[in-house]
């Protein structure tokens, strides 16, 4: 029984480590690497190159938000964000809703009066128009994949 619990703990630890979000710096480096590969004449003919580029753009789009998710409480976010503290905190009104806005160096979090995250606004994206870049990479992957295998 003890071995099974240890094996499950190791498996869970590996999955949690794999699920870590990329830092903005790592995401930018991954996009630059994938873009360089897509410009290589030999690699540009492979579907995997374009899928990797699209995936890198998607990671870059999601990187500034970090591990935050909508519906998270302030306490949960403080736990997962570590030393990342807001630069300023203020009360704002969006539409008819009274919200608490926490401003960070590259994003803004908006919390409901109950303390739940309801909106994430990225103020400094890792890559400009990351979603557009991902869409173009997916289109190119479709064009390159003449057998429609992927």
Language model features with spans:
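Sec-dependent N-terminal signal peptides
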Residues: 4-13
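Sec/Tat signal peptide C-region and signal peptidase I cleavage site
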Residues: 13-19
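Start-of-domain marker
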Residues: 20-70
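Short coil/linker segments at helix-helix boundaries
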Residues: 56-150
